[in-house]
Amino acid sequence: LPLTELQVAYYAIEKNFGDKFVDSFKEIMEALRMANFNLNDASKLLHVHKNTLIYRLDKIRETLNVDPLGNNNDREFVNGFYYYLKRKEQIYQV
C-alpha cells in the first residue's frame, strides 16, 4: 500500500479502537520490538507472565486481523502502526 493509504488506515484504526487499545498496543509492541519479537524476553520487559502477553497479543491479532509473529507482512504493518503512533506522540507531545 502507498504510504498515504497506510496513514489513513492507521488513523482509522487509532480512532475506531480507542485509547485503551492504542495504549496497550504501544506497550506490547515496544516490548516485542526491544525483545526482537521473543515472547519470553518481552514478557520479562513488561513484568507479566508469558501467557498474559500471549493473551494480550491474541486480542491485537483478533482486533486487527494480523499475526505479527507468524507473518512478515503483518509484522511490517504493525511496526508501521507503532511508528505512526510514536511519531504522532512526539509531534503532539500526547
Regions found by a protein language model. Give the residues of each.
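Cytosolic nucleotide-utilizing catalytic cores of signal-transduction proteins
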Residues: L1-V94
